[in-house]
Amino acid sequence: GNSYWDGSMSHFHWCDGYAYQASDFGETDATTGEWKIKTSPSVSYGTNGFFILKDGNSVTDQSPNTNNFTVAAGNLTKTEDCPSNVFCTFNPLDTGTDTGSLLNGNTSYSQSQGDSIGTIMGPKGGKWYWEAKIGSGHGGAGANDSNYYFGACFLKENNTWATNHGAMGICNGGNQSNTFALYNNTGSGSITQPSVSPPAAGTIVGIAVDMSGGTSSIKWFFNGTEVGSITGITHTDFLGCTVVNQRFTGTATMRSIEYNFGNGYFGTTAVSSAGTNASNLGIFEYDVPSGHTALCTKGLNE
């Protein structure tokens, strides 16, 4: 057919001639209350049934049948995201007027100009880490990169991401025209500005958010080295923290950025040398800062 699945799949069962209940494939965790997968359900597959995408990107039938599939074109990208541990992604329902294009399970974003986009998770505490690989169209301060940001936003009731964010980027307005800097719009905290050039295409930016104490902090890393921070952010009335994606204005060419929230990929390219991660949740290019973990459902429940 000419219709294509635009998303991620895991543990795909087709039970030919049978109508099973959801409880045959999943159950409620007695400790956390989460709905969790039954990795080996007791079901029958009939003649034409199959079970693919079990614990990876294999389309070889894992049922007693041999109804194997082949990939007609391209590649199936493996992801750590699965029914038992859902990782953060961007939310296509939480966008501005110019949404750009979301790809690779809503982790890659391409846009020429327009608004921000939110994510599906917004924790109220904890220590979190994610990475973003700068893609095409980012050449440094100047008209072609006006107004792009990435960082974290501490949400308050009836506020948008632009109200209480701490972000790294280039601003083309006010008295800091086309200045690469950290911008703190949270109403509190102090900034350690970067003394490096704007990240060029290919740079992997690590972002670490600490909401574990009475105040919060955001730190930025270029290829594993810390380059700037905002510390001492008060958050007593924050409802949660979300990822700040880029927000472009102007008439520049298409620009892109690829996020790794722990899936181990930037777009369709796997990390080249995974860093250490004490929590063992997620795969990142560089070492995860002490005490931090991936923004995922297992991390939220720790």
Residue ranges and their predicted role:
Residues 98-123, 189-194:
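Secreted extracellular polysaccharide-interacting domains
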Residues 9-13, 52-53, 61, 130-134, ...:
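Short hydrophobic/aromatic patches on beta-strands that form ligand-binding or substrate-lining surfaces
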Residues 8-67, 73-82, 219, 227-229, ...:
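Extended recognition patches within non-cytosolic domains
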Residues 17, 200-217:
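Localized edge beta-strand/strand-to-loop motifs within extracellular or lumenal beta-rich domains
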Residues 35, 222-245:
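Short, solvent-exposed beta-strand-to-loop segments that form ligand-recognition rims
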Residues 110-175:
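Secretory/extracellular carbohydrate-interaction modules
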Residues 182-204:
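Short, aromatic/His-centered strand-loop micro-motif at the edge of beta-sheets
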Residues 1-9, 249:
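Extracellular glycan-interaction patches encoded by glycine-rich segments
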